[in-house]
Amino acid sequence: MELVLKDAQSALEVSETTFGRDFNEALVHQVVVAYAANARQGTRAQKTRAEVTGSGKKPWRQKGTGRARAGSVKGPIWRGGGVTFAAKTQDHSQKVNKKMYRGALKSIFSELVRQERLVVVESFGVEAPKTKELKAKLKAMNLEDVLIVTAEVDENLFLAARNLYKVDVRDVAGLDPVSLIAFNTVLVTADAVKQIEEMLA
């Protein structure tokens, strides 16, 4: 299959297994959920009534004071007491096989092509790290909410995009499924397309 280059009167021959396969929604969902879960720290921790510091002595006698009965100063209803269902540190990570991860990325790229949200260009960059220059360039291409994917990290492009809302720059190695589906349009250079094919082969 072929992908038309937006800035040139030519097309790029690409693999149908990478850019023309059926969309596997269940697989993409599983990989995206796993990716988000793997980003969680899981380091929060609270103390139960058994773990907080405090005396084990009964605060006052059971009967005769007129006050509500109390057996411990560490109970959850007391200030400084333990938490009823205390959060504990836990590992939220989910294992995703390489084959599944690659399959999900192929599915996403294929769906982007089908929905005409993948824009391929011969090359893309800015001469200086100027946000104004990049904004004008994107406006000329009628692009706003866009992920720019290049073969290698372009520092000028990265710095120019840093202060633009809904614009991000990644190299092929830094791609992830969440970023690919988060933007309306994905702008990819021809060199990056070849790298993507090699990575997902």
UniProtKB/Swiss-Prot annotation:
Keyword terms of this UniProt record: Ribonucleoprotein, Ribosomal protein, RNA-binding, rRNA-binding
Q: Which Gene3D superfamilies match?
A: 3.40.1370.10
Q: Which GO terms describe its cellular component?
A: ribonucleoprotein complex; ribosome
SUPFAM superfamilies assigned:
Ribosomal protein L4
Q: Which terms does the UniProt entry file under GO BP? A: translation
| Region ranges (Disordered) | 45-72
GO MF terms here are: rRNA binding; structural constituent of ribosome
The organism's superkingdom is given as: Bacteria
NCBIfam families this protein is in? Answer: rplD_bact
Q: Please give the function described in this protein's UniProt entry.
A: One of the primary rRNA binding proteins, this protein initially binds near the 5'-end of the 23S rRNA. It is important during the early stages of 50S assembly. It makes multiple contacts with different domains of the 23S rRNA in the assembled 50S subunit and ribosome. Forms part of the polypeptide exit tunnel.
Q: Which family does it belong to?
A: Belongs to the universal ribosomal protein uL4 family.
Subunit info? Answer: Part of the 50S ribosomal subunit.
Which PANTHER family does this UniProt record tie to the protein?
50S RIBOSOMAL PROTEIN L4, LARGE RIBOSOMAL SUBUNIT PROTEIN UL4M
Task: Report the protein name in the record.
Answer: Large ribosomal subunit protein uL4
Q: What is the lineage of its organism?
A: Bacteria, Pseudomonadati, Pseudomonadota, Gammaproteobacteria, Alteromonadales
Q: Which gene encodes it?
A: rplD
